[in-house]
Amino acid sequence: MDLTIVGSDNTLPVSDVVFGREFSEALVHQVVVAYRNTARSGTKAQKSRSQVSGTTKKSKKQKGGGARHGALTAPIFVGGGVAFAAKPRSFSQKVNRKQYRSAICSIFSELNRQGRLKVVDAFDVEVSKTKVFAEKIKSLEVVGVGSSLLIVSDEISECLSLSSRNLPCVDVRSVQALDPVALVGSDVVVLTVGAVKKIEEWLV
């Protein structure tokens, strides 16, 4: 299949495996959930009654004082421990390499089918100015106001990185930094010709 290059009459032949396969919602959902869970720090921690600093002396005598109580570190008291206290743990989920690559291909194919995938010859700016970068995006006419844009380039220069980081709803990444969450969460994805070739080398 061929993809039309924005701002040109030329087309770019691409692999059907990457940009023309059937969309698998279940697979994409599984990979996205696993990716987001793996990104969790899992550092939540609470203290149980045995870990709270405090005396273990019986708070009052056993008889004649109403309900019977022991140490003030029990969960029932203010300042006491937490019942079933949470401990740091890993939320990471294993995803097979073949599954991950298939999900990325499925996302690219669906973006292409919906008309949300655009290809440009190259994307770079000569100066580190946000205004220049914004004008370049506007000249492409690929995204509306308020829409999120993901630009994937084979090489990211310092000028491109600096001029793009202050724009809301715009994310510039290299092929190596691609992930399923960024692809799914973007309204429009713009690929350079060089990025398309690297993506095909990675996924085919």
Swiss-Prot record:
GO terms for molecular function: rRNA binding; structural constituent of ribosome. Keywords: Ribonucleoprotein, Ribosomal protein, RNA-binding, rRNA-binding. Residues 42-70 are annotated as: Disordered. Residues 42-52 have a biased composition (Polar residues). The keyword Ribosomal protein applies. GO terms for cellular component: ribonucleoprotein complex; ribosome. The keyword Ribonucleoprotein applies. GO terms for biological process: translation. One of the primary rRNA binding proteins, this protein initially binds near the 5'-end of the 23S rRNA. It is important during the early stages of 50S assembly. It makes multiple contacts with different domains of the 23S rRNA in the assembled 50S subunit and ribosome. Forms part of the polypeptide exit tunnel. Belongs to the universal ribosomal protein uL4 family. Part of the 50S ribosomal subunit. This is Large ribosomal subunit protein uL4. It comes from Xylella fastidiosa (strain M12). The gene is rplD.
